[in-house]
UniProtKB/Swiss-Prot annotation:
Keywords annotated in UniProt: Electron transport, Membrane, Photosynthesis, Thylakoid, Transmembrane, Transmembrane helix, Transport
GO molecular function, one term: electron transporter, transferring electrons within cytochrome b6/f complex of photosystem II activity
Function according to Swiss-Prot or TrEMBL: Component of the cytochrome b6-f complex, which mediates electron transfer between photosystem II (PSII) and photosystem I (PSI), cyclic electron flow around PSI, and state transitions. PetG is required for either the stability or assembly of the cytochrome b6-f complex.
Family per record: Belongs to the PetG family.
Principal cellular location given in the protein's record: membrane
Gene Ontology cellular component terms for the protein in this record: cytochrome b6f complex; plasma membrane-derived thylakoid membrane
Location in or out of the cell: Cellular thylakoid membrane
The organism's taxonomic lineage, starting at the top: Bacteria, Bacillati, Cyanobacteriota, Cyanophyceae, Oscillatoriophycideae
Superkingdom field: Bacteria
Protein name per its UniProtKB record: Cytochrome b6-f complex subunit 5
Protein topology in the membrane: Single-pass membrane protein
TM ranges: 5-25
GO BP term (any one): cytochrome complex assembly
Length: 37
């Protein structure tokens, strides 16, 4: 019963990491546009 929980945790971590990276890139992109414009 531990494997499904572990796979769920790993999947959650991957999703959180991807969303975090995307959010950081979006913030940097917005900041760059503000500086250029």
């Amino acid at each position: 019963m531990v494997e499904p929980l572990l796979s769920g945790v790993v999947l959650g971590l991957i999703l959180v990491t991807l969303s975090g990276l995307f959010f950081a890139a979006y913030q940097q992109y917005k900041r760059g546009n503000q500086l250029n414009g």
